[in-house]
């Protein structure tokens, strides 16, 4: 962290992505505005524990990490995946599993932005139940990198077929996503 063109502190935390960096800088600026030194604010941020459903590690099975994230529209999906890519590097595969569950996503208002939002993922799996639009068609620009399924069990089967040790799976929805996180972890543990 720089303040008045000089180093003022360093934030070391497990959060990734430009959006979290911007939030941290805003917090440091707000703290400075009320009299907290930037170095002290940076040190405090280093102790910050992220909130639930924001790149929350739900578990690891068969060498595969499974995360939960609240991302539920293309910009949030893109931000989450770009941050994860920045964190894990180019060699680690990212499997994005998402449920377009918000009202605007169910209606297909932003469906044309989905391929763009998923660019940082190596593979994408879309749960299509309840949609008023053709997700496979919307994701067609991604080619074989995108798959769709109308129910959770089929979606899990697709992910299991693709997932390998060392991969990172991030499940994104603004709801409970049918308990997919625990179901994936159990299925991965059984599969080995």
Q: Model-derived features: where do they sit?
A:
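ATP-dependent carboxylate-amine ligase
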Residues: 6, 16-19, 25-192
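Acidic-glycine-rich active-site phosphate/pyrophosphate-binding loop
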Residues: 1-10
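Histidine-centered acyl-transfer/condensation active-site motif
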Residues: 13
């Amino acid at each position: 962290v720089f303040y008045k063109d000089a180093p003022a502190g360093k934030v070391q935390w497990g959060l990734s992505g430009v959006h979290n960096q911007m939030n941290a800088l805003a917090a440091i600026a707000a703290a400075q505005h009320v009299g907290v030194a930037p170095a002290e604010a940076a040190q405090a941020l280093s102790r910050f524990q992220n909130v639930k459903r924001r790149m929350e590690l739900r578990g690891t099975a068969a060498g595969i990490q499974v995360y939960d994230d609240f991302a539920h529209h293309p910009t949030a999906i893109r931000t989450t995946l770009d941050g994860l890519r920045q964190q894990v590097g180019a060699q680690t595969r990212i499997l994005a599993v998402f449920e377009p569950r918000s009202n605007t996503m169910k209606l297909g208002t932003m469906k044309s932005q989905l391929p763009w939002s998923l660019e940082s993922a190596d593979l994408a799996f879309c749960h299509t139940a309840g949609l008023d639009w053709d997700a496979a068609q919307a994701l067609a620009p991604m080619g074989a990198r995108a798959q769709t399924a109308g129910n959770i069990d089929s979606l899990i089967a697709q992910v299991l077929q693709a997932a390998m040790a060392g991969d990172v799976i991030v499940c994104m929805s603004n709801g409970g996503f049918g308990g997919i996180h625990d179901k994936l972890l159990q299925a991965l543990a059984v599969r080995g």
